[in-house]
Amino acid sequence: MSEKFSPTLRLGDLNDFIAPSQACVISLKDSKPIVKKSDRPQVVIAPKQQLEPVKISLKDCLACSGCITSAETVMLEKQSLDEFLSALSKGKDVVVSVSPQSRASLAVHYDISPLQVFKKLTTFLKSLGVKAVFDTSCSRDLVLIESCNEFVSRYKQANSDDGENSQSPLPVLSSACPGWICYAEKQLGSYVLPYVSSVKSPQQAIGAAIKHHLCQALGLRLHEVYHVTVMPCYDKKLEAARDDFVFDDGTQDNGDLKLTEVDSVLTTGEIMDLIKLKGVDFKDLEESPLDRVLTNVTEEGDLYGVAGSSGGYAETIFRHAAKALFGQTIEGPLEFKTLRNSDFREVTLQLEGKTVLKFALCYGFQNLQNIVRRVKTRKCDYQYVEIMACPAGCLNGGGQIKPKTGQSQKELIHSLEATYMNDTTLNTDPYQNPTAKRLFEEWLKEPGSNEAKKYLHTQYHPVVKSVTSQLNNW
């Protein structure tokens, strides 16, 4: 069984002889009437029917209470290098968005800086026919701004006179990790989902920016644009395939054409495989100028963004909430207190001897269970929790490049963190990002607006776990 997916999405006792159609429990139809039959024996000669082969897509995996089996290569055929190369060969307008975690992984592997990686990767991808290479740090700033607005709104609502009846209670649980979201929908259901932030992940936010704004601004035909993201996590492939991120073309000629915000997701490891496949010496590639339209890069050529290696959600929202709710400007680094282990930390804001804000970082499913129990028993005293399924967070995603010979996973994570934090990247406030400001002015209007809710928010769906009820429909 492949270890690429997060533990929640794997079924450990399956082998490679099990095909998706055998393991999947999703029904072919929503309902089938129950027909009462007589107990008397009957002989019926029915005409032979030519049955169509059953096809199971990746969306089916997200819609049922099954799991990804060892035949995930079949289900993920549209999330592969072959599909990416096929889109290029068909003359599609291919756009690639690269995550900062993937850049850090490539930087450590090739022993160069993340900025050099980005410029060389731009050279490499454009040599294949890619039209533009963007930076998901840009969309992450959009998401952080919207998340700050969401938290302040939910905090005020929860602390109002009618706070007990709030439909958006505290704590707010972050939503950027697809492994955590899939687990919450399939295993935790309705008692946890109301706490989850409705703000999209940076991957889906940049997909929305490209498909719902940039294409229109540049006069591109939506069905000709093929958007690919490079991510540290295989579960991002599942996220991109959700029905929530499918939309209509909107034109008269292609009114029934279904499009997705992200057409395909490639992991960092798959990008390295592509480099090897093309026989390229990556370190010897020239460094191309970066595409500035959706990239956090200064006029001097430096990258900028938040410092958090898993998105910086807790820190950014904590600083904003301290200022917006209590008038406190926090200078310098936040002092996170380590609790059970380095993957479970908390930070508090004290005013006049009273704790007014209490946030937590929670990485890995072992620590996640602790938070879930507290939420379920209504004993969680945090107002916000940044949750990631992988221990050590996104830098340790299953799609990252594996350790070199003689290097331990722990040593690799330390190298990734040092590279990510000590990069030439400038640590900046998302609210000061000129690209984010422009996108709000031209497209989203302001944080919390109807446009922002339409394009930067999503919803979650508790999945019924009863296999019996599903089998009744077969």
Curated annotation (Swiss-Prot):
SMART domains per UniProt: Fe_hyd_SSU
Main location: nucleus
Coiled coil start-end: none
Stated family: Belongs to the NARF family.
Quaternary structure annotation from Swiss-Prot or TrEMBL: Part of a complex composed of AE7, CIA1, MMS19 and NAR1. Interacts with CIA1.
Function: Essential component of the cytosolic iron-sulfur (Fe-S) protein assembly (CIA) machinery. Required for the maturation of extramitochondrial Fe/S proteins. Required for expression of the imprinted FWA gene, for seed development and is involved in the oxidative stress response in vegetative tissues. Involved in the regulation of cell size, ploidy and cell cycle progression. Required for growth under normoxic conditions and necessary for recovery after hypoxic treatment but its action is reactive oxygen species (ROS) independent.
The protein's name: Protein NAR1
Annotated source species: Arabidopsis thaliana (Mouse-ear cress)
